[in-house]
Design a protein with these regions (language model features):
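Cross-family detector of peptidyl-prolyl cis-trans isomerase
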Residues: 2-150
């Protein structure tokens, strides 16, 4: 009887550990439906370095797509990538230098971490869009790698 109880308790702990483990990929069935109303953060790698905090200067690599839940991993048309250019991007976290979805989504990452951000229009470029590349009211998907925190 005690052995059965201990096995059940161990099973619950294992389920809790699995639930706390970040997914390594965004599965099509797990993608949020449109219209998106909140920021989604999915850690594929949790770094082990310094944590990105508001006010810090952070350096990242990123790739950005128009979010399309009908496409693999929700990645529609790619519109930008620091990786493709071979140049990192540095900005002041929480200082309004980037879209709100980035300020909120990068905060809390650890150096060495990789995070997917699915950003609703109101935390992105909203009704104005951007540069003829991002249409008005677009939901965005970014893969972000945190390189450094100063």
């Amino acid at each position: 009887m005690i052995r059965k109880i201990l096995n059940k308790v161990a099973g619950f702990f294992a389920l809790g550990w699995l639930a706390a483990t970040p997914s390594l990929a965004v599965n099509k069935g797990d993608l949020p439906a449109l219209p998106l109303t909140e920021l989604h953060k999915i850690d594929s790698v949790v770094g082990d370095g310094e944590t990105a905090k508001r006010g810090a200067s952070v350096t990242v690599h990123y790739s950005g797509w128009l979010y399309d839940p009908s496409k693999p991993q929700g990645k529609g048309t790619k519109f930008d990538s620091s990786k493709d250019r071979g140049q990192t991007f540095q900005f002041g976290l929480g200082r309004g230098m980037v879209i709100q979805g980035w300020d909120q989504g990068v905060e809390g990452m650890k150096v060495g971490g990789n995070r997917t951000l699915i950003i609703p229009p109101d935390l992105g470029y909203g009704s104005r869009g951007a540069g003829g590349v991002i249409p008005p009211n677009a939901t965005l998907l970014f893969d972000v790698e945190l390189i450094n925190v100063e």
